[in-house]
Amino acid sequence: MHAFIVPPKIVTGPGCIGELGTEASRLGRSAMLVIGCKSVASAGGTDKLRGQLTAAGLTVEVFENVHPEPPCQDVDTLRQRIKTHGSDVLVAVGGGSVMDIAKAAAILAFSDRPTAEHVASQRLPDRSLPMIAAPTTAGTGSEATPTAVLTDKSIDRKKSIRHPELMMPKVAIVDPELMLSCPPGVTAASGADAFVQAVESFCSKITTSLTDACSEKAIVLTARHLERAYRDGSDLEARQAMAEGSLLAGMALANARLGVVHGLAHPIGGRFGVPHGLACAVLLPYVLEYNRQVLEASGKYARLAGLLGTDPVRFAWNLLKSLDLPSDFRTWPVDRSLIPELAEEGMDSGSTKANPRPATRDDLAALLEKVL
């Protein structure tokens, strides 16, 4: 038996952020508005969002202190603000980090224990606050996943927490107009993450016909429109396609998981500060080559080539060039002596466990030797 978990309600299309007040008023009366995108705040977006919520009868508190790869301490700060304000619904408008911190705060809102303890023990409360997610980047697809990735700064490690029901946003509002001001560099890295998630969820060893349907469409949408969105951020058609592709990839990975790319991207990001999307983009061609034999045997490699219109490994290399991204991490201040530890962390990842080709610690170390 397979359960297919998605947000109860998904609203999409240009201008659909205008439904925010209506949707929030159905879930609560006191909103914690979590904002992370500087372009939203600088364009007066925070005031507009607050205005929609207050017009719908909600009181509003704004939380803007969101860092990339959010640390557990930031979740603790947000949880305290939620208690002080008496918030009964979270509204997250931003990229993947905003979604992560909001989902973590929602599930831990009723706990008195530090976030880091919950992350370490993987024990979560049995109730949460409802949440609305409105992405400002096409990337993580977090508006459609029940997972939050957090950084424990005390050990420089990224770990995820997951609850299939209590951490899934109640409403996903996916408006491409929120993404028009996303800078080219962020568009490239986050969009590459969306593409990689579509590919890895398609190649996962625990796919179903439903996850394949989502990931296949996501692959086509992101492969065809990512460079367009990168070259011209005002291209609404490309932004819409990327928004839908990211959403579908999120729906796929929420149910099929991912693979070694994400299994290694998290420790690389946690240890060396490499942005998550960039880490995923760089790792993809190496991991596709690692998985090639198994994917060819299953027929997935040929199906992926059909979706892309070319050899998948070649496409992954060309994607890096088209987005002006590096082919390895050697320009970053990485410490190669940590490769054994990074490989160990990769082995602990649920993403690695879903990889189509089983991986050993030595396999992961060999991949890391190539990219670091």
Tell what function each PLM region has.
Residues G139, L247-C280, S349-K353:
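Glycine-rich phosphate/pyrophosphate-binding beta-alpha loops
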Residues L338-L372:
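Short, amphipathic C-terminal "tail helix"
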Residues R271-L338:
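Gly/Pro-rich interdomain helix-loop hinge
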Residues Q73-P176:
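Glycine/threonine-rich beta-strand-loop-alpha-helix active-site module
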Residues T147-A256, P356:
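Carboxylate- and glycine-rich phosphate/diphosphate-binding segment that chelates Mg2+/Mn2+
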Residues M1-V89, F329:
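ATP/NTP phosphate-donor binding region
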Residues I17-L20, S42-G45, C72-Q73, S97-A104, ...:
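Short glycine/serine/threonine-rich phosphate/pyrophosphate-binding segments
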Residues G13, L33-V34, P71, G96, ...:
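Buried hydrophobic positions in well-ordered alpha/beta secondary-structure cores of metabolic enzymes
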